[in-house]
Amino acid sequence: MTTACLMSTYQPLALSFTRGLGTRLWDQSGREYLDAVAGVAVTNVGHSHPMLVDAIRDQAGLLLHTSNLYSIDWQQRLAQKLTRLAGMDRVFFNNSGAEANETALKLARLHGWHKYIEQPLVVVMENAFHGRTLGTLAASDGPAVRLSYSDLPGDYIKVPFGDLLAFDKVCVTHGHRIAAVLVEPIQGEGGAQVAPAGYLKALRERCTRRDWLLMLDEIQTGMGRTGKWFAFQHEGIVPDVMTLAKGLGNGVPIGACLARGKAAELFTPGSHGSTFGGNPLACRVGCTVIDIIEQQALVENAGVRGQHLLGRLQEVLGGHPQVMQVRGRGLMIGIELREAIPELTRIAAEQHGLLINVTRGKVIRLLPPLVLEAAEVEQIVQGLAASLDSASYRALERSA
């Protein structure tokens, strides 16, 4: 396999897939794998779902693109479904999570300017990740920001995730310039870190009191992954702005920025736009994904299977010498290791037919499709335990 013609932005495994079905993928030699990554929280309804395949085929034969110069029926339908599920008022469609977050950041600036703040600030979290555009990188934290680019937009102030005392200190020193707060309910790239109970509700109260926009990045957590349609619903709150992507399209590129109240009224014609955003194909796919999730009760399945998986991982790996902590919510689970094991993803795939992801160097991130079955929970647990044992044994051999 050659990558000579591709820019060097990834270091992929020497593994290529030719087809998928449900939670399974098959490589070029016909070997089967259990997919516990789901394209990084994307293929929530599984690979090659027949309803989705039919919708894509049908729409491709009818109409792919017209632009937002004209009304798009499927765009209206998807907006109605999303606002109903989320308790929001309006939607702007684009093509990715980064674009959705850029839209949210524009809303934050507009909100600040409407409050006569010359240089509005957005409060963001340490270890956050919101995308790879310059604006969203500046709002993020971690190696991608520190090592790659300088002179990023500086209208952000970072606070430790989950630390209300630190947040309140920032409110005292910078409150007159703050326009919005941007936070992930569960930090995905940050290592599947779940916001402490009551944290989002406390942010909601503070934002309401100070007329700041509470903006939630639900790009990984949204569309049922945590056992609710959206992770904020675990806290019984509603944000002012929410961003979606990934699972909304199940592999077809789509992003969405939802807003309510005054945040939904900030844009005017010409103030933002997207050539491909909200095209008929992507929006029909989004509608079909929602229909599948509702018809197959996949939100509920994510909650049940996620609780089962988390419990079994804690039982089996809780005492493993390489494991520090097992955490998560629904089917978004992180296993933090004591040290990095560079070969772990390769060992899991090659020896145990299990696809996993590692973030922050030493946090195994499990994001299986929401169609996961009970027997597959045990397959993930046993495959992961065996992979850790194999990797640990190899490390001991090398050090001997």
UniProtKB/Swiss-Prot annotation:
InterPro entries xrefs: AcOrn/SuccOrn_fam (IPR004636), Aminotrans_3 (IPR005814), Aminotrans_3_PPA_site (IPR049704), Class-III_PLP-dep_AT (IPR050103), PyrdxlP-dep_Trfase (IPR015424), PyrdxlP-dep_Trfase_major (IPR015421), PyrdxlP-dep_Trfase_small (IPR015422)
EC nos: 2.6.1.11
Sorted UniProt keywords: Amino-acid biosynthesis, Aminotransferase, Arginine biosynthesis, Cytoplasm, Pyridoxal phosphate, Transferase
Catalytic activity: N(2)-acetyl-L-ornithine + 2-oxoglutarate = N-acetyl-L-glutamate 5-semialdehyde + L-glutamate
N6-(pyridoxal phosphate)lysine: modified positions: 246
GO biological process: L-arginine biosynthetic process
Pathway this chain belongs to: Amino-acid biosynthesis; L-arginine biosynthesis; N(2)-acetyl-L-ornithine from L-glutamate: step 4/4
Cellular compartments annotated: Cytoplasm
GO cellular component: cytoplasm
Binding site for pyridoxal 5'-phosphate: 97-98, 129, 217-220, 275
Principal location listed in the UniProt entry: cytoplasm
Pfam families, per database record: Aminotran_3 (PF00202)
GO molecular function: identical protein binding; N2-acetyl-L-ornithine:2-oxoglutarate 5-aminotransferase activity; pyridoxal phosphate binding
Cofactor: binding details: Binds 1 pyridoxal phosphate per subunit.
Cofactor: pyridoxal 5'-phosphate
UniProt entry tagged with the keyword Transport: no
CDD domains: OAT_like
List of residues binding N(2)-acetyl-L-ornithine: 132, 274
Family: Belongs to the class-III pyridoxal-phosphate-dependent aminotransferase family. ArgD subfamily.
Subunit relationships: Homodimer.
Miscellaneous section: May also have succinyldiaminopimelate aminotransferase activity, thus carrying out the corresponding step in lysine biosynthesis.
UniProt protein name: Acetylornithine aminotransferase 2
Originating species: Pseudomonas syringae pv. tomato (strain ATCC BAA-871 / DC3000)
Gene name tied to this protein: argD2
